[in-house]
């Protein structure tokens, strides 16, 4: 029978301990849009992944899961982890198509893009509020930083190239559909949006005023509750963004 000598096999024991520990704290191969396990093990994380595309994690490591719902709609995205560069390129294409096909006037167009950018700012806010708790708890479940600055720079460049356009009746009808899709996204981050946690409790989800840290400190929320709320809200936003992309396709925006 094999026996370990604690004096002579110190290195072996150390290795075994390290391997065992890594099973619990290192799961870098299990990742999905918006969140990663063991973020520090992946280089340039904040530059490589797009925000908001957050969903419940796949049950296995298989990349065939690949967020099929999103792939079906964002069919030009080849990276199942939604590479930020590809998404930014898609946003450029989408914005140009909105200008060309719907013919939005500059003020209306800028308003809609600002609403989309507002979602990114909200996500930055809630990630900031929860970040200290993630770090202090030494959890491997950590949020990624949104790519808001890079995307906003591209959006601003598109805005600068626009000229005012008078809408036809058809274009106005298309814009109404566009606005309806945007409104759903806005509603998902508004003061009136409630998220349930625990058995019967609900809290208003408004990341401008809601401090997760206060709820956690008062024992109203646990860290896991806060994580779940972020995930749930982002899933809702993601679903509405799917609807928005579907609307664009319906309007023949060539997205």
Swiss-Prot record:
Keyword Glycoprotein: yes
Keywords: Glycoprotein, Secreted, Signal
This protein's name: Uncharacterized protein DDB_G0285615
List of glycosylated residues: 38, 61, 83
Signal sequence coordinates: 1-28
Compartment(s) of residence: Secreted
Major site of localization recorded for this protein: secreted
Domain of life assignment: Eukaryota
Organism: Dictyostelium discoideum (Social amoeba)
CC annotations in GO: extracellular region
